[in-house]
Regions:
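Catalytic PLP-binding core of fold-type I/II PLP enzymes
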Residues: 1-28
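Glycine-rich, charged/polar anion/phosphate-binding loops
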Residues: 32-36, 75-78, 125-130
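Conserved small-domain helix->loop->beta segment predominantly found in fold-type I
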Residues: 106, 117-134
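Active-site C-terminal subdomain of aminotransferase-like
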Residues: 37-112, 116
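A short alpha/beta connector and helix-capping loop motif
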Residues: 24-39
Length: 134
């Protein structure tokens, strides 16, 4: 969405796997934001979830496995299960790099420049060559 839909008071949940850390995002408008880290943040094998506190509750559907309740993980400090240490380490490296590069605003600007370049290249009738040093 270019703009968020009017949910008329319903909880907005979003899978942001494809756009995580590509631009600033107002997460206060969402109940749950989650995404796999494998595209923009780190190696496959981990999901980052941001869950509004009022949604972390013991009131779940009957039969929901313990492992699939937000409260289980929140109460355990996100360490209910063995953490994927390598993935956490690599994500940390990306977060530090991202901060050093200027944060999410800088990523949005880079994305805009990339879009302009690829649009120009797509609509050009001339071949485009880039010289590289060997």
């Amino acid at each position: 969405f270019k703009t968020l839909p009017n949910t008329k008071g319903k909880i907005l949940v979003s899978d942001v796997s494809s756009c995580f850390l590509s631009e600033p995002m107002d997460i206060s408008k969402y109940g749950i934001v989650y995404g796999g880290v494998q595209k923009n943040i780190g190696p496959a094998g981990m999901v980052i979830s941001i869950i509004r506190e009022d949604l972390i509750t013991s009131d779940v559907l009957e039969g929901t496995p313990t492992m699939l309740t937000y409260k289980t993980h929140a109460d355990a400090g996100s360490l209910y299960n063995t953490p994927n240490c390598y993935c956490i380490y690599m994500c940390g490296k990306v977060f530090k790099w991202l901060k050093a590069m200027g944060g999410l605003s800088a990523m949005k600007e880079r994305q805009n420049c990339s879009t302009i370049f690829w649009m120009r290249a797509s609509y050009s009738r001339e071949p485009w060559f880039q010289r590289i040093a060997l």
